[in-house]
């Protein structure tokens, strides 16, 4: 979580993710709701299976946060199924609105942050985003203050190391290659 937090320190960026991340999740649940199966006589959709796998990971990390994510996912799955029930044309249109809109909102947030999205460096961070947002709410309510402090400390250290490594790289002038001369 500290890796993800290092990319999300600006309040405006965090706020954008509270809007954008659920929009993207909802968008994915729409086409996944069209894939229906019977497992032991129980009708399920690919949206339910996908959410179940991700939630299993969250339960390994933290049970109270996973329970919160279970509630959020249940609402998003329900909404995804409702939209999917409108038919393919409307479903795909809403998918596009939520998916593209969610990414645009997050990218605006990252412009405020002045940093690229975490998933640009580690694709797995796409699964961390939802539980990170749940943790932010829980931390604001006083949940596990020691964990919150440790995450923030590691995030700040990661940002400092990233800034240090980016400033320690040799810089080249755009003119140095054109003139053929080298400065000492």
Predicted regions mapped to residue ranges:
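Cytoplasmic-side transmembrane-helix entry/capping segments in multi-pass membrane proteins
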Residues: 66-75, 121-123
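Structural signature of hydrophobic alpha-helical transmembrane segments
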Residues: 33-49, 92-97
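Transmembrane alpha-helical segments that form the membrane-embedded catalytic/substrate-channel core
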Residues: 52-65, 69, 82, 98-115, ...
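Membrane interfacial helix-start motif at the N-side
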Residues: 1-22, 28-31, 54-64, 112, ...
């Amino acid at each position: 979580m500290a890796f993800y937090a290092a990319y999300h320190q600006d309040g405006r960026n965090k706020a954008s993710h509270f809007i954008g991340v659920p929009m993207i999740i909802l968008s994915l649940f729409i086409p996944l709701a069209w894939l229906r199966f019977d497992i032991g006589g129980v009708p399920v959709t690919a949206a339910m299976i996908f959410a179940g796998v991700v939630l299993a990971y969250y339960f390994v990390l933290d049970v109270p946060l996973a329970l919160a994510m279970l509630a959020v996912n249940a609402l998003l799955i329900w909404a995804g199924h409702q939209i999917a029930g409108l038919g393919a044309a409307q479903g795909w249109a809403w998918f596009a609105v939520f998916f593209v809109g969610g990414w645009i909102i997050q990218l605006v947030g990252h412009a405020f942050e002045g940093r690229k999205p975490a998933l640009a460096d580690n694709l797995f961070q796409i699964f961390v985003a939802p539980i990170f947002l749940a943790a932010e709410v829980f931390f604001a309510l006083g949940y596990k203050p020691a964990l919150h402090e440790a995450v923030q400390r590691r995030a700040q250290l990661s940002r400092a190391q990233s800034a240090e490594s980016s400033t320690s790289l040799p810089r080249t002038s755009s003119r140095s290659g054109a003139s053929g001369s080298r400065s000492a």
